[in-house]
Amino acid sequence: MVLARVYYELFSHEAEWLDAHSGADAELGRQLRLEMTDGSRVFIAWAWGADGDGYHVEFAPHSFCAGAPEVDRDVSAWPLWSPLVGQPVTLSYVGEGQQVLAIRAAGAAAYCCSFGRGVWGMDELRVGDRPPQHDREPARGT
C-alpha cells in the first residue's frame, strides 16, 4: 500500500482548532482517512469491542461514521504526514489492547492512539509523531 493522501474528517469546531495549530498533534472526534495510490482507502477511528464493552483504535476499508464529515481536511503536506506520502506504509498495533496503531514507512511513523493530554480517553483519536507516555492503562471494559 503506497500512501497517496491523508485526510482528517472533522467536525467544524475541530477544523477551527486545526487552523490555529496546523502541524500539531491532533485529537479527532471523527476519523482519519488514508488514501492509497491504487484507489483503496483505510479509515482509522474509535470502535467499541464486539461485546460493546471495550474500546480500541480500529482500521478498516470502510468509514466508521454515518454521513459526510462537516470538514474534510487534506493534511498530506503536514510535517507529520509528508515523510509517509509516496511511500509503502504498514499499519501495526503497538503493545496490547489495540490502543496504539503505528503507521510506518521509510523510517518515519505516525501514531493513532487512545492517550492524549495526560489521560486515557475515548471518543477521540489522538494523532501524533510519537507513541503515548502514560501513567496508567485504561480499565478493561471501559
Report residues per predicted region.
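Surface-exposed, interaction-prone regions used to assemble/regulate multi-protein complexes
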Residues: 1-142
